[in-house]
Amino acid sequence: MACYGVLVRWWDRGPYHDPHEEAWLRFVDGRPVSAITTRFLEWSCTKLAPAGKTALLLVWDNASWHLSHEVRRWIKAHNRHVRQTGRGGRIVPCPLPIKSPWLNPIEPTWVHGKGKVVAPDRLLSARELAQRVCAVFRCPYEPHLAVPKKVA
């Protein structure tokens, strides 16, 4: 099982402009691949739309499913559609240098979360693990993204 995540930072419009963070997570049964990455991006953009956000800034490591031609092509087509229709938010990928996870804002969140979900006395089922992760990050448990049969 794999997990895709976006750490969303919101700034309140109140007098103090306090930021708060939300984790948006989707689990995958199997390995992450480009087709799943594009589905996750589409889902993320759909969630951002009601908030009136105009861009999704992605801080990404160099995983192959982040850098693939399929993903880059999908992002380019998505951004073209946003520009042509004036609806939605563009995606701005910001690739990190190789072997530099400390530059990714979501990494400390993952590290702290991992320690809270493990069960020292037994292995957790995939569903139990996903539910615990969602409880720690206070996010809804969404249906798992499916790996298309042709790439499985």
PLM region spans:
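C-terminal anion-handling pockets and recognition modules
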Residues: 90-92, 99, 103-152
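Electropositive, glycine- and tryptophan-enriched low-complexity nucleic-acid-binding patches
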Residues: 1-53
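Conserved beta-strand termini and adjacent loop/short-helix elements that scaffold enzyme active sites
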Residues: 27-28, 94-98
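Aromatic-rich, lipid-facing transmembrane alpha helices and their immediate juxtamembrane interface loops
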Residues: 48-51, 73, 78, 93
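Acidic/histidine-rich, metal-coordinating catalytic segments
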Residues: 53-67, 96, 104
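Short, conserved catalytic/metal-binding motifs centered on acidic residues
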Residues: 5-6, 41, 60-61, 104-107, ...
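Short, aromatic/basic amphipathic alpha-helical patches
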Residues: 68-84
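A short helix-to-beta-strand connector/capping loop
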Residues: 54, 82-92
